[in-house]
Amino acid sequence: MEKSSNTTGSGGPKSDSQLPEKLRRTFSARAAKIKARKANRETSAAKIQRAWYIYVDKSLFKLLKHTVCAAEYCVAHELLKKVSPTEAALLKDPSMKCKVRFRFSGETFPPCIVFKIFLKSDSRGFTYFSGKNLLKPSSKAVADAYKIMGERKFYQQIMQDEYIFQKFKIADHMDVVTVQDYMQFCSLTDETPASSGGKNNYWRRLNLSNIPRTMMMYDIVDYAESGVISDRLQKEKKYLLQKPRTEEMRLHQLDIVSKVRYPTITTIRPFYQPWEQKREMKHLGRRSKKAQKRVEKMKKAYKESKEEKASSQEPPASRTQIKKKVIFYTPSFEILKVEELIDTDLESEERELFAWYQDLYVKHSSLF
């Protein structure tokens, strides 16, 4: 009985309730490890993706910066000519001393490129004439303008001026007190249309239609808008993204961006080949005996015709050494006799042949 009691107490089977608990612990530990690995992979992938996006944005901003610098210092007149030819002619006028400046604009990335025309005063004052500043309320010109414009348009103009004053608070020279007010007033007059007494010289956006397709600038702006990089930009991208170490390198980068590149003219080879090249070509396949004989005959005939042409081009020899082959045949083209004659006088020979042919023709006609 003692033996049986020992066996049951020490070596008996474990209960079923203990096994699932251990399995649950192992499964939960494995699931926690797998979940941690997935989380680590997701975080690492997000870090790599974020770093890649930062690199792409930085490289794109560098290319756009090259575009702005090249547009301002190299091809400002060419770009303005496509936007407005009259303003481009004004830019070329040496008495005006105008300058076009390009900047970035926009609330999202990538930014858009805008431009504006500035007039260098060089300590000289320029006066812009506008009815808003010249027509005083107490002058007779206001009454005349009221009669010409009409009551409706006149009151609309007054209401618009009051709306601009309430919105910006600085809409006239009398409102300027500090330098900040003066800068705000200048920007307001630039953006205000000419019909309302402004200069109508606001920041305008540079579109793809204003850039020539032959320039690298077009590929850069297209890459910023569509996200598709061209083959031409892909080749020069590595060099353009480098930091310029010298002034020559910086100018070379700007020259690459603004240089006009004409499309290369590809030479189209004809489908046919000249007869000189056909002679050099060798047939690689097998030929039958008949084909080989035919080719040999054609070669012989070609050589004979070539020799005859060469002999005909030689200077003619004396009449005494000319050989002539005479063939006698019937009207049914049956050959009677072939003779080789060497005569000194060709005219006598022709006369004899003509007489012989006449006799033969008379005899042949008498048979019928």
Curated annotation (Swiss-Prot):
Q: Where is the composition biased (Basic and acidic residues)?
A: 293-311
* Top-level taxon of the source organism: Eukaryota
Report residue spans for region: Disordered. 1-22, 282-317
Q: What is this protein called?
A: Uncharacterized protein CXorf58 homolog
